Amino acid sequence: MNLYKSIEYDFEDKIIDYLKSIGVDTSKIDPKTLATSIDLLAKKSTPVEKIIFLVNHYFAKEKIIFAFRHNVSTIFHSYHHHDFYELIYIVEGKGELFVDEKKYLLKKGDMAFVPPNTLHKLIIESDEENLRCIMNFDEKYLKSLSSPNTDLTRFLGILSKRNTNLISFSNVDHKRLLSLFNRLNNNYLSRDYGDDLRVKLSLTDIFLKINSCAIEEEDSTIINGFNENSLVTKAIEFIDKNYQNKITLEKISDHLCMSVSRISHLFKEETGLSIIEYTIKKRLLLAKKMLLEGESTSKIADSLGFSSLPSFYKQFKKEFKITPKEFLIYSK
């Protein structure tokens, strides 16, 4: 593990600096427990309840954030989402990744990609030796690194076509990628002349390798999700197809031929969310997209099955820590 210059909290420090630059009081925020600190402060209804959104806003502006995590457990054990792509690379150890209805048992050499505004959760326990690389990136940024003959976003289309979020690397490819990530790590931390360009070169090499492996495996099958016949999978599929309508627990239970109490218990046990919570999250993610497309809040609330406009506003602010109007302002 000594090969890696640890930057476990480097991007948290960057976020703190960013928040200070826009006038947010960060005196009560510990960079080492940023997400937890934000959550606690937000629950107290302080002015920093907007921070979670602002962090997403910062990521969107920066285009790429990178860090190694060594023996650090995951904070979010329930479904959450981001406004950017997330790359999760298991260097050592193992973990469980849930992306909508899919479940992946991650091991050394596995790399997973979570698209923007996709419900997911990663579970890695701190009592086991683990090292993972986390990278948040913007698809447009990868496009900017591409050439007319080489599209660095090609692997995203391959994964989508194969209905998976996972690429598994051989031992040889794994060692090569570690070397590339270590080089990126050093360049990313450095402030020497030319290191901004070296970061771009390192990123280009990394995504060239990722694309090459994805293309080689295009015809193989590496999906290891929920049992395709599992009731939770069927429930999620039903919700994903119908969440824009006014679906109820009774409709879901009728579809699955199972009691409301039983499917509710299984769903909560498997996903960490209640069926209602999951459905609301799916609706709110679509609401963000509709807002950016110019739809009115009243039309969004009605078309997505919210009981009233005040109910929509309340749920939106609860989820994103910001009102729909503020969301549009910060998204400009």
How would you name each of these model-derived features?
Residues 237, 241, 246-250, 258, ...:
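Terminal helix-turn-helix DNA-binding modules in bacterial transcription factors
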Residues 2-69, 119-186, 212-217:
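A hydrophobic/aromatic-rich effector-binding and dimerization subdomain
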Residues 101-116:
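Short acidic-glycine-tyrosine-enriched beta hairpin
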Residues 80-97:
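Short, conserved beta-strand element in jelly-roll/cupin
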Residues 1-4, 303, 313-332:
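…primarily DNA-binding HTH/wHTH and HhH modules…
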Residues 109, 262-267, 311-312, 316:
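Short hydrophobic/aromatic patch on the recognition helix
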Residues 163-172, 188-199, 208-237, 241, ...:
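Short, Lys/Arg-enriched, Trp-marked, Pro/Gly-tolerant hinge/linker segments that flank
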Residues 66-82:
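Conserved short histidine dyad/triad with adjacent acidic residue
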